[in-house]
Amino acid sequence: MNLLISFLLTIQTSVTMLFTLPALPYTAEALAPTMSQETLNFHHGKHHLAYVNNLNNLVKGTRYETMDLEAIVRESDGAIFNNAAQVWNHTFFFEQFKTTGCEAKGNVRTAIEKKWGSFDAFKTEFNNAGATLFGSGWVWLVKDANGNLEIVKESNAGNPLT
């Protein structure tokens, strides 16, 4: 019995992870006028898909082949990191949109207002962070180790996991 369990565990841990492009949780035109269907299709169907395909090709035959996406982002560097982090970033990005529009509420809203004084002041600072980010990259609202909210700018594929 122990031999069978050991064999099954070996098979399970040697299965190759194949990353796929997540389906959008809304239609491509649902975010207009905030984001046009053309822009959404370009970023999801071209950029995001390219990162997924690149990552699958890059991890073949490496120690990353059986890892989940977050582990790859945390442990890799170079081209594998860049593509894995962009898959994670884009997936997170597309999951945040709501077709009905909304503002933060509850504990998040309270923490934002405590830190920035008002939700509008937060939006101004967040938008300014994006507008002043040189080149490509991401702007994140994060909670630091002490529980404080911060706006963080990351170049290229950088993200809060790293």
Label the model's feature ranges:
Residues 15-162:
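Feature for soluble, non-membrane regions of globular proteins
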Residues 1-10:
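Sec-dependent signal peptide recognition
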